[in-house]
């Protein structure tokens, strides 16, 4: 205790533990708090029809979401997904420039995926790196074009990112109304909210359901941000 008192004089706050295994939990909590303002936006879209037949309406939603996240003080991480990445970047830069801020990796971190068959083995590492830097993962759309069958299919990469984000204890925010894989993820979580979130109550349940409601762009973004806000005061957290 005398040694602990000496540490406090140097503004070092010691933490007592009962068991060595608690160190892992403490480190996880430190990492969560460090990353809680970092948002990973997972999305790809060859088409947007399950959300809107108007492509511009879809890209406007993505841009506005990105802009509002920056406004709220969040930092954005993006893998530059097809049909989504450019809109994410545009929305973020628009807000950063409006506030005369400098662009850096803290506010906007981009990790474009290397293309070509030889690079596909690296994609898993790319995903893990991005998600490890985030505290929140938002899932939108999630489809791609299958040239072999000449059709639009669900994006398996988004499913992998969902699984990784869950393992990393990210706050999972599936915007189900955008359709495709994002809707599949919303459905999976909706079946058992307590598997992904703690202290599930009526407020959280209603907020989660709103992520699947089609509405005006501004209202949808409000629904997304309101859901995230529920986890800010510590009442709710992502489930371990």
Segments the model singles out, each with a brief description of its role:
Residues 12-34:
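Short, structured interface segments
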Residues 1, 47-238:
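Acidic/glycine-enriched connector segments
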Residues 1-17:
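Domain-level recognition of nuclease-like catalytic cores that cleave nucleotide substrates
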Residues 35-46:
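Short, hydrophobic/glycine-enriched beta-strand segments
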Residues 7-9, 34, 103:
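A generic structural signal for short, non-catalytic loop/turn and secondary-structure boundary residues
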Residues 10, 32-33, 133, 168:
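Alpha-helix C-cap/termination motif
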Residues 10, 239-240:
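C-terminal, charge/polar-rich interaction regions
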Residues 27-35, 121-128:
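Short, surface-exposed amphipathic charged segments that create phosphate/polyanion-binding patches used
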């Amino acid at each position: 205790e005398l040694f602990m008192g000496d540490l406090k004089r140097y503004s070092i706050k010691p933490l007592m533990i009962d068991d060595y295994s608690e160190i892992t939990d403490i480190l996880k909590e430190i990492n969560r708090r460090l990353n809680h303002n970092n948002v990973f936006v997972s999305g790809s879209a060859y088409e947007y029809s399950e959300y809107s037949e108007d492509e511009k309406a879809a890209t406007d939603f993505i841009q506005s979401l990105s802009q509002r996240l920056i406004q709220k003080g969040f930092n954005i991480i993006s893998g530059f997904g097809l049909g989504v990445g450019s809109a994410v970047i545009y929305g973020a830069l628009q807000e950063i420039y409006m506030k005369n801020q400098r662009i850096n990796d803290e506010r906007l971190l981009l990790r474009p995926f290397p293309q070509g068959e030889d690079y596909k083995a690296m994609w898993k590492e790319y995903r893990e790196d991005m998600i490890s830097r985030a505290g929140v993962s938002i899932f939108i759309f999630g489809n791609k074009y299958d040239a072999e069958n000449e059709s639009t299919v669900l994006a398996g990469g988004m499913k992998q990112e969902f699984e990784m984000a869950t393992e990393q204890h990210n706050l999972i925010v599936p915007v189900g109304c955008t359709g495709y894989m994002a809707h599949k993820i919303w459905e999976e979580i909706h079946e058992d909210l307590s598997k992904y979130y703690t202290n599930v109550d009526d407020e959280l349940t209603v907020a989660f359901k709103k992520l699947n409601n089609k509405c005006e762009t501004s209202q949808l973004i409000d629904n997304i941000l309101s859901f995230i806000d529920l986890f800010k005061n510590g009442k709710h957290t992502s489930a371990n």
